[in-house]
A protein has these predicted regions:
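A short, N-terminal "cap"/entry segment at the start of jelly-roll beta-barrel domains
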Residues: 1-37
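Short histidine-centered beta-strand/loop micro-motifs
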Residues: 26-28, 43-49, 90
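Short, charged/polar surface micro-motifs in flexible loops or helix N-caps
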Residues: 30-32, 41-43, 59-62, 101-103
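Short, conserved beta-strand element in jelly-roll/cupin
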Residues: 39, 48-64
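Short acidic-glycine-tyrosine-enriched beta hairpin
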Residues: 67-84
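Ligand-binding loop in jelly-roll beta-barrel domains
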Residues: 83-106
Length: 107
């Protein structure tokens, strides 16, 4: 199987006033992995992951708080988060975001 997803096929989800996700590869395509371009311009409330997540920062000047530890990320950095981690963020970023399994699919 293969699937090409064009930019005009993405589905944009408004997570909050300052946080959006342009979803390209979703659980409707495959339950194994999802891919989005996420953007933050401000403060992200704490959340707990139910899946593994990787951020590749296209542009970034952002501080994450991960299980109480501050982690600063810049453009070109990669951040891996294991499932069950509680994290929040403050700053600005645009990132390719990959979830395994696909976002919204329980392990």
């Amino acid at each position: 199987m293969y699937k090409k997803i064009s930019n005009n096929e993405k589905v944009t989800r408004k997570i909050s006033e300052v946080h959006t996700a342009d979803n390209y590869l979703t659980k409707e395509t495959t339950k194994n992995i999802s891919l989005a371009v996420t953007k933050l311009t401000g403060k992200m409330d704490p959340s707990k992951l139910s899946n593994e997540r990787v951020y590749y920062f296209i542009s970034a000047d952002v501080n994450f708080i991960i299980d109480g530890e501050k982690v600063h990320c810049n453009s070109g950095d990669v951040l891996y988060l294991d499932s069950d981690i509680i994290y929040s963020a403050e700053g600005d970023f645009e990132a390719v975001t990959i979830n395994v399994p696909a976002f919204g699919v329980e392990k």
